[in-house]
């Protein structure tokens, strides 16, 4: 009897992989093990729940049992994996053991909470379950501090503000989206946030949190203080690698794999936010989709290398949305910006005047696809 392909985790990466496997093979045995309910939801929707007045259960697109039945898989929901026995090729879940032919880590990533005094007063919104846990507090809150002005923090700040909250957005950098684009390119979105009423505190970060009679006082490294009702940590994600590390697999920023998504153990693979593919983390939907297509083939006997074209990344800030592609943080690039009443197009050119990256914003988002084709031709 053929052993299972066992997948640990039930997020976007795992579901994409299962669907791709079923396109290629209707009968190969697949077992999905997840510590949560395994219900399907769209994680990017978490950035818009407050303005859309959605509760956690509203996000569910498909129950886990229905997904399992539709794709003919064995489902172990609400089941925590405690160890991997590589010699026996078994996944250990307490007293239960499951044999595997191939094993896939799709364990995702967890939100980072800075190790500061009062960190217990912070909450995170990195999953449907986390939102379910905290939604009552967020609905009641009038003053919200968002720590981290990256992609998720910026999206959350705008959403909370549009929902009528008084929002403070804090980052140690001098501009928003510092890991994604230079300040001159993010400036219009930054202006839009302030026009919406978001208070921006840049070049500083939270040093200490202290509970008061009327909220939580945040003290910053520059000496300022702000009292709020809730604090959301959006400073970044850390790949969930503990299980892989305990199994003596190679781990750095994520679970290390080659271009075939394979770890040094030829029976074990990694996919999604937990995977470090060729030294890179790729925590966006499109590379995960393409990775799932490649991995499905490899689990069934192929040896395909993942190749990724230039891909669009969307910053979902409805009052001034952005799309970007390419090496937007390259230090040797020259940016050309073009503005009109419809929005912005910013192009990053190299020394040979070749397009290496771009950002489009506002109503000029429709120009992204022609630029993406141009970018693909030059890379």
Swiss-Prot record:
Reaction catalysed by this enzyme: 2 reduced [nitric oxide reductase rubredoxin domain] + NAD(+) + H(+) = 2 oxidized [nitric oxide reductase rubredoxin domain] + NADH
Keywords: Cytoplasm, FAD, Flavoprotein, NAD, Oxidoreductase
Bridged cysteine pairs (disulfide): none
Keyword Glycoprotein appears in the UniProt entry: no
NCBIfam families: PRK04965.1
Protein function: One of at least two accessory proteins for anaerobic nitric oxide (NO) reductase. Reduces the rubredoxin moiety of NO reductase.
Record's protein name: Nitric oxide reductase FlRd-NAD(+) reductase
